[in-house]
Amino acid sequence: MDNLQSNIFVAGQRLNDLTGYSSIEALKKDIHTQEERLRAARLRVREAKDAYAAAINNRSTSQREVNELLQRKHAWSASDLERFTHLYRNDHTNEVAENEAQEALSAAERESEEAAAQLNKSILSRYHEEQVWSDKIRRMSTWGTWGLMGVNVLLFLIFQIAVEPWRRKRLVKGFEEKVIEAIEKEKAMHHVEILAPVNAAQEIPAAPSADSSAPVVAAVPSPAAEETASNAISTEVLDVPDSATPAPDTTTTPNSQNSLNDLLESAKLQLSRFPPPTSVESWRQYISDLFSDRNLVITQRDLSSLALQSAAAGAAIMGLVIALIRPR
């Protein structure tokens, strides 16, 4: 699981490098750093302002007290003289502290302005990079849509030029094989029906001849018996053509053969009506069949798949049209 997550992370990083999104991520981190820097600079500006205001207030208080002492210098006491000396000595220190606070405030303000300018620059760079990345993704999406449409058109042409004729030829060949198989079965059935009476006719005379020969061999050679035997044999021989009827069967054999030949010729004639798959007539029939009123039986799954494919194709075409007519 850890390897899968690491592989997904590496794949996402590679994809970001290819699309140029890694630079946008770096700019985001830089903007976050600049925001922290600007926040700290503004805090220092606020502290410097407070320190500068405190220094100004301290010096103003000292100068105000010095002025009050100078106004009543004719009534000074020893403590007033000592206080005036201390305030006059600290006035220079207060002035230096005020100047240092002013310089610190100016430096903090300059740093804050630089941080704000750098932040604005980083934001503009990020906006520019995002625009470039968006244009690149839009361009890749447009080319990808064109590529998918080209693949679909190529598959359609391959299916119509190669697969559809092969499937049609296979169907025609299968139909021919089934017709030939049915004709062969019908021939075999007719052959069996023709040979069955002939075999029966050949088996029927054999039994009487065997039966008649037995009494002839066992009989006593008398003139009356010989006459009766000869009459019986002659009547049996005359009855054999009547019992066995091979003549009508031999006449039906050419008729059945002719009917089978007629059936085969009609099947070949119907198959010859189909034009070759690479001809213009075949394309014309195919296009007219697409817009014909022929009833079809389609499953719900095929209908849903057709609707989804149509919706995807329409969305792709509309996206392509919007991408083409959209102003830069």
Curated annotation (Swiss-Prot):
The keyword Transmembrane helix applies. The chain crosses the membrane at residues 143-163, 305-325. Belongs to the SHE9 family. Its main location: mitochondrion. Keywords: Coiled coil, Membrane, Mitochondrion, Mitochondrion inner membrane, Transit peptide, Transmembrane, Transmembrane helix. Residues 21-123 form a coiled coil. InterPro entries: MDM33_fungi. GO terms for cellular component: mitochondrial inner membrane. It comes from Aspergillus oryzae (strain ATCC 42149 / RIB 40). Residues 164-304 are mitochondrial intermembrane. Homooligomer. It is a multi-pass membrane protein. This is Sensitive to high expression protein 9 homolog, mitochondrial. Residues 326-328 are mitochondrial matrix. Required for the maintenance of the structure of the mitochondrial inner membrane. Involved in mitochondrial morphology. Causes growth arrest when highly overexpressed. PANTHER family: SENSITIVE TO HIGH EXPRESSION PROTEIN 9, MITOCHONDRIAL. Residues 241-254 have a biased composition (Low complexity). Residues 225-259 are annotated as: Disordered. It is found in: Mitochondrion inner membrane. One of its GO terms (biological process) is inner mitochondrial membrane organization.
